[in-house]
Amino acid sequence: MYLINQNGWIEVICGSMFSGKSEELIRRVRRTQFAKQNAIVFKPCIDNRYSEEDVVSHNGMKVKAVPVSASKDIFKYVTEDMNVIAIDEVQFFDEDIVEVVQILANRGYRVIVAGLDQDFRGLPFGQVPQLMAIAEYVTKLQAVCSVCGSPASRTQRLINDEPAAFDDPIILVGASESYEPRCRHCHAVPTKQR
């Protein structure tokens, strides 16, 4: 998978909630550390579910991270001696994240991003589709549908144990109290045309 002769490329890890995106990002970062490469991890300030300064997977794996408010703030922390730049919850970053990732890869960094490819309505989420289009590698993970057990590619938002309506706010940071993985057929969004 990583037989590139030139330094600098983009990897996207995407999928529904509970599919293991953060876990996979952490795994890749740890592998770079075993290889004696310098890595730095970023997360959006909005993601404070489990920790302010760590990327934490739903199963408890974690790695230190720098929380940033804006995409271009990433440049303040990147130094020439680094090899790998990892960014979790990339869907929460502003539209500049695509340009930032491109610049970093063009400067020779291996850039690994992880995020939701669809919002709770089943529509493309934030800048993730653009990042998938420019990436050298895309890994799409699936969870297990909480209703029928099939592979889950969607994230169901629940409000009082009922599916959220199509016109509810797109961003609501949460975990299992607000979301569960669903397959195409068990995913429900009231007032959305099928």
Swiss-Prot record:
Main subcellular location: cytoplasm
Annotated compartments: Cytoplasm
EC number: 2.7.1.21
Signal peptide range: none
GO molecular function: ATP binding; thymidine kinase activity; zinc ion binding
Binding-site residues for ATP, renumbered to this chain: 15-22, 88-91
GO biological process, one term: thymidine metabolic process
SUPFAM superfamilies: Glucocorticoid receptor-like (DNA-binding domain), P-loop containing nucleoside triphosphate hydrolases
Residues binding Zn(2+), per UniProt: 145, 148, 183, 186
The keyword Metal-binding appears for this protein: yes
GO CC term, one of those recorded: cytosol
Catalytic activity: thymidine + ATP = dTMP + ADP + H(+)
First-level EC class: transferase
Keyword annotations from UniProtKB, A to Z: ATP-binding, Cytoplasm, DNA synthesis, Kinase, Metal-binding, Nucleotide-binding, Transferase, Zinc
Active site location: 89
PANTHER family membership: THYMIDINE KINASE, THYMIDINE KINASE, CYTOSOLIC
Listed HAMAP family: Thymidine_kinase (MF_00124)
Subunit structure, interactors included: Homotetramer.
The family this protein is said to belong to: Belongs to the thymidine kinase family.
Protein name according to UniProt: Thymidine kinase
